[in-house]
A protein has these predicted regions:
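Non-catalytic N-terminal regions of enzymes
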Residues: 1-197
Length: 197
């Protein structure tokens, strides 16, 4: 890994004729190495990837969330769903971020494990009777999209809708795009909702 850092450093030195730029790059590189290898592991955090940082940085005007809906032909057993959620979050490394929240300090973006994480805070059963698909879309547009997450908790919530037309049920999930992409989110929801057969 240090080999790649040295190549990158050499490249910057070749293109930089300004001494101040070279000093800036060397000092930034040193701070990055210090943070990544010595300080951040001590505080149980991990540096985010560039894509995580791109999709996780948000302002009041700019948020990047995925809202997904998956319907089922039968009623879903809630205790079984909670067990599967716990298993999947623990089993698959890519979903480990669901227990972390995103931070940025000194220009470094990183994930911090939430000290107060409980699955029950991210799971809500909705007992509202949905007369048709339009009522479901309205729930997603008005209720789910309007949720604001505090900065110190993982930015996701899963809703279980029990009373859809035809005795169907559904998952509706809102999650930060920095945690998952659309395909991995659908895979996650399908493994949580798969039947025993």
């Amino acid at each position: 890994m240090l080999f790649y850092y040295s190549i990158l450093l050499t490249y910057f030195l070749k293109i930089a004729f300004d001494f101040n730029f070279v000093v800036y790059i060397l000092s930034s590189f040193g701070v990055f190495l210090l943070l990544k290898h010595f300080l951040l592991p001590f505080f149980d955090v991990e540096i985010s990837t560039i894509l995580d940082a791109l999709f996780s940085l948000e302002t009041s005007e700019n948020t990047c969330y995925i809202v997904s809906c998956l319907t089922f032909e039968e009623e879903i057993d809630i205790p079984t769903i909670l067990i599967k959620l716990r298993q999947n979050i623990a089993k698959f490394p890519q979903f480990n971020k669901m227990k972390k929240h995103f931070n940025m300090k000194f220009g470094v973006c990183y994930w911090t494990k939430s000290s107060n994480f409980t699955l029950e805070n991210h799971f809500e059963v909705i007992n509202t009777v949905f007369e048709n698909d339009e009522a479901l879309y309205e729930f997603m547009a008005k209720h789910v999209n309007e949720i604001k997450f505090p900065k110190n908790i993982p930015k996701w919530k899963l809703f279980l809708l029990k009373n859809l037309p035809g005795n169907k049920s559904a998952f509706v999930m809102k999650i930060s795009h920095g945690m998952v992409d659309g395909i991995s989110l659908m895979n996650f929801l399908m493994t949580v909702g798969e039947s025993k057969e």
